[in-house]
């Protein structure tokens, strides 16, 4: 039996494989930046309907919300580790808020959080 030929009419040539059809462009989709901007704006309009906010102020507020979120999440994580639990519950979050926020601010935050959790559980 004769050996197969690799060159000749039927042989495939090694080269670049065509990945995209001949009309497609190389434009890449931009990654979306997530922020709390729309929620900050909604709260602003509830409290002061006639007041606006600059993009610089919005950026500062967004950084503030991210910072507070990270602090509360970190503290709640530590509390769940101390209690040998693998899940962060509303109890850990509430305790973290009490530890991180001072006096009256903590009381208001806890009551608003409790109200939000109650509203969520009743809507289910």
From Swiss-Prot:
Belongs to the histone H2B family. The keyword Ubl conjugation applies. There is a cross-link at residue 119 (Glycyl lysine isopeptide (Lys-Gly) (interchain with G-Cter in ubiquitin)). Residues 1-32 are annotated as: Disordered. Core component of nucleosome. Nucleosomes wrap and compact DNA into chromatin, limiting DNA accessibility to the cellular machineries which require DNA as a template. Histones thereby play a central role in transcription regulation, DNA repair, DNA replication and chromosomal stability. DNA accessibility is regulated via a complex set of post-translational modifications of histones, also called histone code, and nucleosome remodeling. Residues 10-19 have a biased composition (Basic residues). This is Late histone H2B.2.2. It comes from Psammechinus miliaris (Green sea urchin). Its main location: nucleus. PANTHER family: HISTONE H2B. Keywords: Chromosome, DNA-binding, Glycoprotein, Isopeptide bond, Nucleosome core, Nucleus, Ubl conjugation. One of its GO terms (molecular function) is DNA binding. Glycans are attached at residue 111. It is found in: Nucleus; Chromosome. The keyword Magnesium does not apply. SUPFAM superfamilies: Histone-fold (SSF47113).
């Amino acid at each position: 039996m004769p050996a197969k030929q690799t060159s000749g009419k039927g042989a495939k040539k090694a080269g670049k494989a065509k990945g995209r059809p001949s009309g497609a462009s190389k434009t890449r989709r931009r990654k979306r930046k997530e922020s709390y901007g729309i929620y900050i704006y909604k709260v602003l309009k509830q409290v002061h309907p006639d007041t606006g906010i600059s993009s610089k102020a919005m950026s500062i507020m967004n950084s503030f919300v991210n910072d507070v979120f990270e602090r509360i999440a970190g503290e709640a994580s530590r509390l769940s580790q101390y209690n040998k639990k693998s899940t962060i519950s509303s109890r850990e979050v509430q305790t973290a808020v009490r530890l991180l926020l001072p006096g009256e601010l903590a009381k208001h935050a806890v009551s608003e959080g409790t109200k939000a959790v109650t509203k969520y559980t009743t809507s289910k």
